[in-house]
């Protein structure tokens, strides 16, 4: 027998029982010795190679949430009946589903594809988009938009440009080919992400209530069908290796093939699925992402009648040399698995044939409570599917208060030199405007199609993306994502609250009512007790804040092992907030459109410069405590903004966050090129702050709005009645010359042309022409 033939000898269940002492490469597959011992105990024998492959990917950190599960339960525990009222599907499914009225529902979710995007930036990012879109399809929805949250290393590092070009082009390629508008997100640069970029992709879809589908395999005798792209060798072990281990300082030491995406195949798959749903041909459905067939079969069986029989050799292959174990672990893209009644199978196959989507019947649902997999007539797996998909190991990792955090918090920004003169304030405002993190991101966003589909109401650079759902009524949704790793490094509990508060505020500023949350929790190694302390604090803070704001977490993702060597990233919980708007015609943009309107600052300004963009940009400083979170004030502000938009009292709204008032003013000016005259004296007098804090503080629960003069009295009355401090700080104005100007009275003035030049040049100068 040749070596090649020997490699393909099938390890059957009978053989596993007969050879209990055979050594197996469990460690190479990411399993710990005690986990391997648990598998043997569950099975009463050693696992077959196929079973070992299944357990290794499904018990990985990425799939099992074994280090985070004990904390994530808080999201399901800290809820009220009112929070559940409009929640059709919560955590545990492929994506959350929210009732938005008129028989419509929205499903949305954010997930990470961090490690693959470092190994192969283009394909890693592209397949991140494809994977999250399939989660949306699997709920019975039509995907209608995507967003992304990106974190890269220092902007001036040569490797950063390579990763940025690949990631952005991968996202734009896949999303644009699918015909999905990319309506928002954030991009930040920091050396802490140098060896570990974050690529978090969000997708959102719409569906009628009656079209909702879930991932379960119910109905003994129903057929299990795999359809979509053929199965290849790409992504094998991705969940257990790429997403569940750290990178060494020299780069990734384990390099399984990153998945390869085909957006045109996915576009056809979307339309095929929607027709199958319309014709009511699907009983249950699951997309194939992390862990591939291992995940789809075990999860469908666990959530249904508990049993399934699969003929693995019926899987259509791109590479006929793949072993059974490789087929089980493959993460080839653009694949779905459906459960179909036998009497509807011919109709199902006719629809997939119409769309030229390759389809194979793999097996059927059984009532045995076992997942049995055969390979060329021999049994290679016989497991309780719940032990694979649900009842995996759960760890309560050691938690330790970081040894360095007290010193970091003691190093407050209050000791930093503040600008006093008008010239110094002007110089520093421009420095922030042109800094890597606050500069215009159109070099990135212009590679995305914002308006494909014709239903985009708001997109970059507005505070939230907004999509019209119903053409007749104007019903729509808004969505915003936010994160601030610098705040979380100072205080992960308060930092997570701040991320939620900003996304909540952004949605409210668009005119929508915040309704639900998704999150992607990006952290270092869970084997580091200090990282686990950060994680536990962030989850506690986020769950507490959701409860106080009255909006439920519908699902999301945890991404651990984001570190290079022993250096973890900043804790970076990404929070997405979905809001509902009854008519997108009432949407509010984040910039001034008309001259002669009054500019109001809503909320109170405090001397809060710790962790700020000003401290980082001007002084290279990180220390102290993040801004105080006042969720009651956030709620009052959101309700006021919504009421003002409904009554037509405001023509623009922009939240205050990174860069404070200075950044919000310049972005509002640049949105439509309308200048402004602003005075800071009343802020200083009322709030007791100096000019620098008035401009650069990042105090929360604040926004600036523009109000037509004829609505001024009504608007003031609205704010007074709702307990929201409102201070008139300026007017929109063309300026005395031919060029619009942003004038901070008695301090400085900057022409809009200069603001635009500074704001737009940073990324283009650093990254050059768009590649591809």
From Swiss-Prot:
ATP binds at residues 65, 109, 519, 556. It is found in: Cytoplasm. It holds the Pfam family AIRS. Mg(2+) 2 binds at residues 135, 287. One of its GO terms (cellular component) is cytoplasm. GO terms for molecular function: ATP binding; magnesium ion binding; phosphoribosylformylglycinamidine synthase activity. It is an enzyme of class 6 (ligase). Mg(2+) 1 binds at residues 111, 557. The active site is at residues 62, 113. GO terms for biological process: 'de novo' IMP biosynthetic process. The keyword Nucleotide-binding applies. InterPro entries: PRibForGlyAmidine_synth_PurL (IPR010074), PurL_linker (IPR041609), PurM-like_C_dom (IPR010918), PurM-like_C_sf (IPR036676), PurM-like_N (IPR016188), PurM-like_N_sf (IPR036921). Substrate binds at residues 112-115, 134, 259, 331-333, 559. Its main location: cytoplasm. Transmembrane segments: none annotated. Its EC number is 6.3.5.3. Monomer. Part of the FGAM synthase complex composed of 1 PurL, 1 PurQ and 2 PurS subunits. Part of the phosphoribosylformylglycinamidine synthase complex involved in the purines biosynthetic pathway. Catalyzes the ATP-dependent conversion of formylglycinamide ribonucleotide (FGAR) and glutamine to yield formylglycinamidine ribonucleotide (FGAM) and glutamate. The FGAM synthase complex is composed of three subunits. PurQ produces an ammonia molecule by converting glutamine to glutamate. PurL transfers the ammonia molecule to FGAR to form FGAM in an ATP-dependent manner. Belongs to the FGAMS family. This is Phosphoribosylformylglycinamidine synthase subunit PurL. The gene is purL.
């Amino acid at each position: 027998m040749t070596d090649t033939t020997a490699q393909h000898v099938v390890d059957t269940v009978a053989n596993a029982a007969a050879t209990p002492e055979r050594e197996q490469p469990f460690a190479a597959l990411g399993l710990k010795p005690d986990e391997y011992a648990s598998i043997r105990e569950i099975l009463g024998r050693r696992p077959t190679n196929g079973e070992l492959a299944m357990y290794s990917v499904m018990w990985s950190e990425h799939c099992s949430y074994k280090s985070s599960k004990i904390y994530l339960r808080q999201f399901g525990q800290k809820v009220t009946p009112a929070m559940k009222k409009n929640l059709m599907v919560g955590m545990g499914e492929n994506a959350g589903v929210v009732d938005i009225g008129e028989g419509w529902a929205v499903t949305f979710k954010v997930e990470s594809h961090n490690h693959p995007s470092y190994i192969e930036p283009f394909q890693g990012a592209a397949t991140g988009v494809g994977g999250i879109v399939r989660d949306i399809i699997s709920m019975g929805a039509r995907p209608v938009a995507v967003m992304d949250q990106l974190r890269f290393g220092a902007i001036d590092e040569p490797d950063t440009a390579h990763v940025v070009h690949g990631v952005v082009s991968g996202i734009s390629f896949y999303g644009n080919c699918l015909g999905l508008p990319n309506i928002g997100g954030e991009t930040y640069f920091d050396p802490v992400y140098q060896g570990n970029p974050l690529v978090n992709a969000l997708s959102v879809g719409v569906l009628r209530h009656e079209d909702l589908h879930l991932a379960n395999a119910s109905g003994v005798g129903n057929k299990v069908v795999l359809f979509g792209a053929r199965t290849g060798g790409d992504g094998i072990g991705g969940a257990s290796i790429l997403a569940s281990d750290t990178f060494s300082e020299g780069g990734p030491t384990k390099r399984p093939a990153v998945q390869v995406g085909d957006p045109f195949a996915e576009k056809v798959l979307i339309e095929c699925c929607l027709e199958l749903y319309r014709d009511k041909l699907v009983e249950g459905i699951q997309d194939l992402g992390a862990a591939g067939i291992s995940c789809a079969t075990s999860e469908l069986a666990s959530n249904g009648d508990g049993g399934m029989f699969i003929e693995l050799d019926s899987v259509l292959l791109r590479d006929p040399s793949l072993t059974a174990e490789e087929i089980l672990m493959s993460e080839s893209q653009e694949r779905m698995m459906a459960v179909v009644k036998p009497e509807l199978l011919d109709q199902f196959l006719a629809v997939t044939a119409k769309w030229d989507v390759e389809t194979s019947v793999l097996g059927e649902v059984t009532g045995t409570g076992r997942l049995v997999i055969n390979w060329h007539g021999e049994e290679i797996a016989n497991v309780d599917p719940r032990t694979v998909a649900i009842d995996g190991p759960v760890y309560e990792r050691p938690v330790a208060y970081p040894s360095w955090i007290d010193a970091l918090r003691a190093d407050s920004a209050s000791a930093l030199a503040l600008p006093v003169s008008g010239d110094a304030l002007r110089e520093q405002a421009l420095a922030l405007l042109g800094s890597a993190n606050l500069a215009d991101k159109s070099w990135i966003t212009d590679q995305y199609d914002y308006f494909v589909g014709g239903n985009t109401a708001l997109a970059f650079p507005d505070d939230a993306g907004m999509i019209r759902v119903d053409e007749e009524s104007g019903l729509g949704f808004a969505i915003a994502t936010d994160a601030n790793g610098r705040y979380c490094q100072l205080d992960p509990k308060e930092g997570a609250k701040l991320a939620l508060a900003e996304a909540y505020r952004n949605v409210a500023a668009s005119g929508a009512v915040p309704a639900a949350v998704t999150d992607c929790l990006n952290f270092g190694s869970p084997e580091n007790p200090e990282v686990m302390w950060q994680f536990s604090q962030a989850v506690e803070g986020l769950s507490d804040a959701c409860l106080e704001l009255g909006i439920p977490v519908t699902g999301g993702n945890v991404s651990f092992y984001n570190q290079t060597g022993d250096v973890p990233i900043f804790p970076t919980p990404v929070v997405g907030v979905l809001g509902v708007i009854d008519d997108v015609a009432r949407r509010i943009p984040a910039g001034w459109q008309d001259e002669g309107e009054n500019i109001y600052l809503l909320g109170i300004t405090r001397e809060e410069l710790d962790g700020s963009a000003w401290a980082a940009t001007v002084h290279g400083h990180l220390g102290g405590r993040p801004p105080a979170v006042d969720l009651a004030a956030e709620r009052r502000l959101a309700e006021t903004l919504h009421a003002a938009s409904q009554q037509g009292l405001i023509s623009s709204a922009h939240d205050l966050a990174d860069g404070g008032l200075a950044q919000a003013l310049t972005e509002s000016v640049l949105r439509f090129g309308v200048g402004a005259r602003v005075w800071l004296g009343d802020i200083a007098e009322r709030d007791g702050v100096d000019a620098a804090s008035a401009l650069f503080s990042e105090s929360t629960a604040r926004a600036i709005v523009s109000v037509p003069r004829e609505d001024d009295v009504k608007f003031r009355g609205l704010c007074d009645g709702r307990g929201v401090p409102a201070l008139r700080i300026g007017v929109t104005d063309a300026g005395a010359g031919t060029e619009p100007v942003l004038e901070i009275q008695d301090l400085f003035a900057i022409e809009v042309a200069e603001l635009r030049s500074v704001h737009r040049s940073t990324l283009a100068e650093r990254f050059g022409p768009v590649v591809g």
